[in-house]
């Protein structure tokens, strides 16, 4: 008898299986495709967002910032390549600066580490090949990239080694 059934083994299903595999639970993952991360996850942009987009005070804001830090820890634990490259949101006209200011304020309220506004000069010094009409940027150094396929596969492999059943080519219809 199963304690937990997880439907889908993209990055969310694999992460759920990985975390649950550390408990004494009978867990199974049912994946419709013939491999892990074979649908939406493998086409993901690979960006681990810093957390300045969600509305402050929401669960999404809290989970975005916590999840970004947790992903870094899991990648290190599972030897998944992780590149903390930061992110820039550019303003190409003065009219766009208030939007960046709002994102900055969200980031501060959400606890995004190291987030800051950059002048045009600071932005171009950081990324000299940008369009010369840049007037400023929002910089979030905690943003990172990771191969979503490698990340999901590593978590699924550990989950299976820890006793989670993985059923591939097994769509759930109801």
Q: Can you describe what each PLM-predicted range is?
A:
Residues 2-29:
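N-terminal Rossmann-like FAD-binding beta1-loop-alpha1 element of flavoenzymes
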Residues 21-43:
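Glycine-rich FAD pyrophosphate-binding loop
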Residues 25, 112, 164:
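Short phosphate-binding/catalytic loops that engage adenosine nucleotides
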Residues 31, 84, 119-120, 168-170:
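Short loop/edge segments at beta-strand edges and connector loops
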Residues 37-38, 125, 174:
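Conserved protein kinase catalytic core
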Residues 46-126, 135:
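Dinucleotide-binding Rossmann-like beta1-alpha1 core, especially the glycine-rich loop
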Residues 138-174:
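Helical element adjacent to the flavin cofactor pocket in flavoenzyme catalytic cores
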């Amino acid at each position: 008898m199963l304690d937990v059934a997880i439907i889908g083994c993209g990055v969310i299903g694999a992460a759920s299986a990985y975390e649950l595999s550390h408990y004494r639970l009978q867990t199974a993952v049912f994946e419709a495709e013939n491999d892990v991360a074979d649908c939406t996850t493998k086409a993901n942009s690979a960006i681990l967002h810093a957390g300045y987009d969600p509305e402050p005070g929401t669960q999404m804001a809290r989970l975005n910032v916590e999840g970004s830090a947790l992903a870094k820890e899991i990648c290190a634990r599972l030897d998944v390549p992780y590149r903390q490259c930061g992110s820039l949101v550019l303003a190409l006209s003065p009219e766009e600066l208030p939007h960046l200011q709002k994102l900055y304020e969200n980031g501060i309220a959400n606890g995004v580490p190291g987030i800051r506004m950059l002048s045009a000069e600071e932005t171009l010094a950081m990324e000299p090949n940008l369009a010369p009409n840049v007037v400023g940027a929002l910089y979030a150094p905690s943003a990172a990239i990771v191969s979503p396929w490698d990340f999901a596969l590593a978590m699924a492999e550990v989950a299976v080694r820890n006793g989670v059943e993985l059923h591939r080519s097994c769509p759930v219809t109801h």
